[in-house]
Amino acid sequence: MKGLVGKKLGMTRIFTKDGISIPVTVIEIKANRVTQIKNLDSDGYLALQITTGTKKASRVNKPKAGHFAKANVEAGRGLWEFRVSEQDATVFLGHTFEVSMFKPGDIVDVTGKSKGKGFSGTVKRWNFRTQDASHGNSLSHRVPGSIGQNQTPGKVFKGKKMSGQLGNERVTIQNLEVVRVDVVREILLIKGGVPGAVGKDVIVKLAVKA
């Protein structure tokens, strides 16, 4: 398997032997436990479903509790799925993947849910330029301006950049470098920033474009 699920703990910096400061994101990756193995016969594709972390038994509904019990694993805080090859699909239920799967120098893609910033205008959301502050303009400083053309086409095209929800969406940052792997504390140090707020789940995969 080429990916793991972890929790973003925040950012810090480390120093090289030459005294160069490197900004890093700290990601805690507890053991990822296999809860289901999907195959071509029953599901039409090969994948491993995994969970990580823990969850109070009182907060797990009966279908989920039965699903975890069938795999004989402790209930985790969520379920994630990774497409795998036939060779990787030969593991057994309850098998664990550790942070030691990565090594310093690996290039990874990190996926998470970006911080929600609420309803935002076009200047903040799409980097539109503002209109004149004066010279006859008294009401239209931060408005987007015209959103259409004329009688033809007589509509606003789908995908038009307008005001709306900013953030709170799935984002992937590609080609980040693994700087350090701490197997004892189960943490990964990745150069640069990754999507999401502190404490939120992120998916770390080996880069597809490296």
From Swiss-Prot:
Any one Gene Ontology molecular-function term assigned to this protein's record: structural constituent of ribosome
Membrane-spanning intervals of the chain: none
Any GO BP: translation
UniProt key word Ribonucleoprotein: yes
Record InterPro entries: Ribosomal_uL3, Ribosomal_uL3_bac/org-type, Ribosomal_uL3_CS, Transl_B-barrel_sf
Any Pfam family matching the protein: Ribosomal_L3
Modified residues annotated as N5-methylglutamine in this record: Q151
Subunit structure, interactors included: Part of the 50S ribosomal subunit. Forms a cluster with proteins L14 and L19.
Protein name according to UniProt: Large ribosomal subunit protein uL3
Gene: rplC
